[in-house]
């Protein structure tokens, strides 16, 4: 958790340093106070955020299994579904907390360095963008949860999750016509909501795809967790 906070702060600080350097070095205003959080979001969504989600998911399932703390948890008067749901909920709360922290920090930094460009609608777009990013990242995290209940070793799950992430991004580019079926291609789906013209059909289609994938991954993950010999 501490590592996530430190790296998130570094991402925001480095981003602002880059923007300030370009502004003073070339005389160009790259982004304003409300555009800066969107730039930061684009960066962390494809780098730090999924990486943090992978680490947390592995720690919750493979980590507890290897340290035998899972057995202690299951000895309590609670069903396996309750344990699994609690772990998934904690994973979801971690993603929400990380997004909220980065959003507030990047907004603060943006206001400090570019106070004149702040606007109410800009802030609304930032909040909407960060909120919408939760769904695709959470669905990807459920893939890691599924892998954690299939493979025993945490290191193997980590590398496989990274390969899945890279593979989905690669296939989303190569097979652009079918990119909607690769969850990582929807990490930036918030742009559909904040653009000048809103494509309602595409938004609805992606909501259905992510919801369907999320339900199937959660159900399959729980089935494997329930059958798992701890």
Segments and roles (model prediction):
Residues 79-81, 85, 122, 153-158:
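Membrane-helix interface segments
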Residues 63, 76, 107, 111, ...:
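Transmembrane helix-loop junction
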Residues 3-55, 85-150, 193-212:
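Secretory targeting signals
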Residues 53-57, 70, 105, 143, ...:
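Hydrophobic/aromatic residues in alpha-helical transmembrane segments
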């Amino acid at each position: 958790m501490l590592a996530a906070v430190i790296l998130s702060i570094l991402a925001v600080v480095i981003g602002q340093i880059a923007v300030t350097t370009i502004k003073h070095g070339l005389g160009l205003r790259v982004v304003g106070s409300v555009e800066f959080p969107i730039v930061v979001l684009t960066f962390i969504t494809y780098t730090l955020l999924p990486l943090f989600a992978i680490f947390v998911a592995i720690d919750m399932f493979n980590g507890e299994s290897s340290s035998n703390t899972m057995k202690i948890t299951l000895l309590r008067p609670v069903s396996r579904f309750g344990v699994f749901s609690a772990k998934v909920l904690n994973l979801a709360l971690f993603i929400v907390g990380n997004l909220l922290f980065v959003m507030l920090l990047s907004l603060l930094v943006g206001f400090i360095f570019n106070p004149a460009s702040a606007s109410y609608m800009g802030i609304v777009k930032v909040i909407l963008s960060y909120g919408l990013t939760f769904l695709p990242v959470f669905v990807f995290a459920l893939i890691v949860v599924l892998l954690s209940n299939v493979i025993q070793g945490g290191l193997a799950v980590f590398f496989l999750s990274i390969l899945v992430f890279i593979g989905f991004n690669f296939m989303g580019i190569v097979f652009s016509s079918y990119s909607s079926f690769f969850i990582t291609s929807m990490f930036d789906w918030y742009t559909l909501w904040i653009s000048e013209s809103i494509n309602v059909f595409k938004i609805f289609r992606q909501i259905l795809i992510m919801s369907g994938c999320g339900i199937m991954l959660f159900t399959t993950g729980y089935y494997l967790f329930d059958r798992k010999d701890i």
